[in-house]
Amino acid sequence: MTQVPDNLKYNRTHEWTRLEDDGTLTIGITDHAQSELGDLVFVETPTVGRHYDAEEACAVVESVKAASDIYAPVGGEVIEANSELQDSPELVNTDPYGEGWIMRIRPDDSDDLEQLLDPEDYQDLVADEE
């Protein structure tokens, strides 16, 4: 069964977003996404300091099966990329909602989070895809 934490927001391309206390967003790929991809062998993290628009490709994850773009769920500037993933891409598989986070951004408008899926809607999306 796919883990879908109830304190996160989701988008249709299987990224999760967590609003931090300082107003920044931590972003990664969902448990469903990492499961579908299989064992990750490489993560290309986004460029710190670069601005990405909502739904713009900003990172890449590669597994033994496929490569997949990661999309910015909302517009904003990347303030941190998870450097641990350079040497340990498997963190995305083993802890997708924790140590396997991919980036942190400062959103242009935190109200944009309202456009993302809540956990129940994301679970419905995953169920429809299976």
Swiss-Prot record:
Disulfide bonds: none annotated. InterPro entries: Biotin_lipoyl (IPR000089), GCV_H (IPR002930), GCV_H/Fam206 (IPR033753), GCV_H_sub (IPR017453), Single_hybrid_motif (IPR011053). Residues 24-106 form the Lipoyl-binding domain. Binds 1 lipoyl cofactor covalently. Residues 111-130 are annotated as: Disordered. The keyword Cell wall biogenesis/degradation does not apply. Its cofactor is (R)-lipoate. The lineage of its organism: Bacteria, Pseudomonadati, Pseudomonadota, Gammaproteobacteria, Chromatiales. One of its GO terms (cellular component) is cytosol. The modification N6-lipoyllysine is found at K65. Belongs to the GcvH family. One of its GO terms (biological process) is glycine decarboxylation via glycine cleavage system. The glycine cleavage system is composed of four proteins: P, T, L and H. This is Glycine cleavage system H protein. Keywords: Lipoyl. NCBIfam families: gcvH, PRK01202.1. It holds the Pfam family GCV_H. The keyword Calcium does not apply. The glycine cleavage system catalyzes the degradation of glycine. The H protein shuttles the methylamine group of glycine from the P protein to the T protein. The gene is gcvH.
